[in-house]
């Protein structure tokens, strides 16, 4: 039974909201991070390139489910959203209000396995990667749950320095880093991310950049700073201080999983002994996966 306007207002006020939703009757949820509103609109626009019709969809870091509900609206046959901090507002209010079949689970992405979750045609992975302490393991967990020819839409804070675009880069800021946020710890650049996912049989299909913003160190002082300033007078085309590494923006990518796309389908060692990709995957799992760590019998 649909709630009245007064009941909706009262219900919305019981929860804290990350996403903004129009519930009708002039009632909306009030986001705690309204500065992200334009970025969410940007993400939704980019997702027009994804065909959700009849697809099984996983939304990682779903929060209140903005993209989960949108995937369902665009024709997905099944949508599962996972988050470390399950949105009770989404479960108790939004899903019933929208008469939605979206499922939401409190779950860490490192717990993802095909055995427990199955595989998905589309995986949405927005605003999470740059928070991961173990990005390679997290990406592997996700790709293992992606169907062959499946699509992953990945959005993250990225290093977009034009001076390093030809270098496979992963920046892990520490101490007095200009990234200036304690949970923001993993910043790939586009080439670094594409190369990493290529090793996991994923091909980059499309890329978009949202409002590049330059983040720089505070102006340096002392003899070394004065020497650099002198160098810039002599070589005026040098990049501005701090921009060489620390250009940051949000980017969204579409990757497609294709078996055999990895350039390292076989691994050559100095002994010229060759091992299959299946052996390499088994080695990775036995080394890093706590559930299979006991199985050390790896055969070429």
Language-model region placement:
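Conserved N-terminal segment of class I S-adenosyl-L-methionine
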Residues: 1-118, 222, 230, 247-255, ...
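Short conserved AdoMet
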Residues: 52, 133, 147
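A short SAM/SAH-binding and catalytic strip from SAM-dependent methyltransferases
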Residues: 122-135
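A short glycine-rich, Lys/Arg-flanked "PGG" loop and its adjoining helix->strand segment in the class I
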Residues: 136-151
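Conserved class I S-adenosyl-L-methionine
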Residues: 154-176
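Short aromatic-enriched loop/helix-cap "lid" or pocket-rim segments at secondary-structure transitions
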Residues: 163-169, 216-222, 266-267
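Acceptor-substrate binding/catalytic loop of class I
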Residues: 176-191
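Conserved S-adenosyl-L-methionine
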Residues: 202-213
């Amino acid at each position: 039974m649909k709630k009245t306007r007064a009941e909706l207002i009262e219900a919305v006020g019981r929860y804290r909201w990350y996403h903004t939703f129009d519930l009708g009757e002039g009632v909306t949820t009030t986001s705690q991070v309204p500065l992200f509103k334009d970025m969410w609109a940007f993400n939704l626009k980019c997702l027009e390139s994804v065909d959700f019709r009849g697809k099984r969809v996983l939304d990682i870091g779903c929060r209140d489910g903005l993209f989960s509900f949108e995937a369902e609206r665009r024709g997905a046959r099944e949508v599962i959203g996972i988050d470390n901090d399950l949105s009770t507002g989404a479960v108790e209010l939004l899903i019933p209000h929208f008469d939605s079949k979206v499922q939401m689970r409190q779950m860490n992405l490192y717990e993802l396995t095909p055995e427990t979750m199955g595989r998905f045609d589309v995986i949405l992975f927005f605003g999470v990667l740059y928070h991961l302490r173990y990005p390679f393991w997290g990406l592997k967990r996700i790709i293992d749950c992606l169907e062959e020819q499946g699509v992953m839409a990945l959005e993250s804070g990225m290093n977009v320095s034009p001076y390093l675009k030809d270098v496979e880069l992963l920046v892990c800021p520490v101490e007095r880093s200009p990234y200036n946020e304690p949970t923001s710890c993993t910043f790939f650049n586009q080439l670094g991310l594409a190369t990493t996912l290529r090793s996991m049989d994923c091909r980059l299909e499309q890329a978009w950049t949202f409002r590049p913003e330059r983040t720089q160190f505070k102006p340096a002082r002392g003899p070394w700073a004065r020497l650099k300033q002198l160098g810039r007078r002599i070589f005026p085309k040098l990049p501005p201080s701090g921009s060489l590494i620390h250009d940051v923006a949000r980017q969204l990518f579409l990757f497609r999983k294709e078996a055999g796309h990895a350039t390292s389908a076989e691994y050559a060692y100095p002994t010229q002994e060759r091992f299959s990709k299946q052996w390499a995957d088994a080695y990775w799992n036995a080394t890093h996966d706590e559930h299979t760590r006991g199985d050390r019998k790896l055969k070429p």
